[in-house]
């Protein structure tokens, strides 16, 4: 899937996720040569250097949560997993974003995996001492284990398949749900038509900025 593509990985990304990238034909490179930037922690020093770079400030670089790789590895329809849903914003913006849309999609799936792991561990304990009546069933179960495994993985990725129809995951709106605009389009010019545009740097509280702007405009 990533044949010939180059990816940079933050130190917060596990070796398992990096291996998925390589198994799909991707190559590991430095930041400047990379086509994709992956991280699992917006506060990690490696990722902070990206956020503070000129490329990121000028919108020439985007950081993605590396759980995207796990998502495509656990689904048969790899192209159905939207990369845009895994954009990893700076830590200073995440609290504000969660307040507006809820948990990020990778947080939802991580929680699902933990619950799935707990259920499987509990089931294993119950099956340590099978009753005589279940011995034949266990034999058949072992025989069909490989057949059932893909079904489990497919269910694990259900939130991704139903997304963005199921907007309870992150609150993003599907493009299909947007109304079509039939009027004339005009270029947006900051400072005109009653709208202003601001560039926010470093870890500034978004709510404080909004309040300051309201006082300035009132």
UniProtKB/Swiss-Prot annotation:
Any single GO BP term: spermatogenesis
Subcellular location: Chromosome, Telomere; Nucleus inner membrane
Pfam family, one: TERB2
GO CC terms of this entry: chromosome, telomeric region; nuclear envelope; nuclear inner membrane
Region annotation Disordered: where it falls in the sequence: 117-143
Keywords attached to this entry: Chromosome, Meiosis, Membrane, Nucleus, Telomere
Consequences of knocking out this gene: Mice develop normally, exhibit no overt phenotype, but are infertile (both males and females). Gonads are characterized by the absence of post-meiotic cells.
Tissue: Specifically expressed in germline tissues.
Function: Meiosis-specific telomere-associated protein involved in meiotic telomere attachment to the nucleus inner membrane, a crucial step for homologous pairing and synapsis. Component of the MAJIN-TERB1-TERB2 complex, which promotes telomere cap exchange by mediating attachment of telomeric DNA to the inner nuclear membrane and replacement of the protective cap of telomeric chromosomes: in early meiosis, the MAJIN-TERB1-TERB2 complex associates with telomeric DNA and the shelterin/telosome complex.
Oligomer status and interactors: Component of the MAJIN-TERB1-TERB2 complex, composed of MAJIN, TERB1 and TERB2.
Family to which this protein belongs: Belongs to the TERB2 family.
Protein's name according to its UniProt entry: Telomere repeats-binding bouquet formation protein 2
Organism field: Mus musculus (Mouse)
């Amino acid at each position: 899937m990533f044949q010939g593509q180059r990816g940079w990985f933050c130190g917060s990304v596990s070796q398992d996720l990096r291996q998925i990238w390589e198994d799909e034909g991707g190559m590991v490179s430095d930041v400047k040569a990379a086509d994709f930037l992956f991280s699992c922690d917006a506060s990690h020093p490696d990722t902070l250097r990206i956020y503070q770079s000129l490329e990121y400030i000028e919108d020439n670089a985007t950081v993605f949560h590396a759980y995207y790789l796990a998502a495509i590895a656990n689904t048969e329809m790899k192209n159905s997993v939207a990369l845009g849903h895994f954009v990893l914003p700076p830590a200073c913006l995440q609290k504000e974003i969660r307040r507006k849309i809820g948990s990020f999609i990778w947080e939802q799936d991580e929680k699902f995996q933990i619950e799935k792991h707990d259920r499987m561990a509990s089931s294993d304990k119950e099956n340590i001492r099978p009753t005589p009546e279940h011995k034949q069933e266990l034999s058949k179960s072992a025989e069909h284990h490989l057949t059932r495994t893909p079904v489990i993985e497919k269910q694990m990725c259900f939130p991704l398949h139903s997304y963005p129809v199921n907007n309870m995951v992150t609150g993003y709106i599907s493009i299909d749900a947007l109304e079509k605009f039939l009027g004339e389009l005009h270029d947006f010019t900051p400072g005109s038509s009653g709208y202003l545009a601001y560039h926010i740097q470093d870890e500034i509280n978004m709510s404080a900025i909004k309040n300051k702007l309201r006082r300035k405009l009132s």
